């Protein structure tokens, strides 16, 4: 198993620790000391599915592949705008793929579970190219 392409997409709006201190009982110093985080990107005008599809398309481009080459889509995420359909199936439609799709909800460790699931699909011959 190997990763042959990556892609990312980020919300345009930045939320600083100082912004948070205006709406919560906290401070930049308190957050930085405990987490090391100074800023984070938050979705305001964008939506999760569009950002995921943008990242997926960039990963395909980086790998020199087309959506038709994908056998399976795995999406690991914590934030869902609604229960159904899955983010993976929305991404499938947005990029023009036609394959099985699944969302995994495992918070920060989700990437590890997604890689483990992908490896199992590859080892059993159920998929060759996984997004």
Predicted regions and their residues:
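Conserved "HGTGT" condensation-loop signature of ketosynthase/thiolase-family condensing enzymes
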Residues: 1-71, 95
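Conserved catalytic cysteine-centered active-site region
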Residues: 32-34, 38-50, 77-130
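Short glycine-rich or small-residue beta-strand-to-loop segments that form or flank ligand, phosphate
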Residues: 71-77
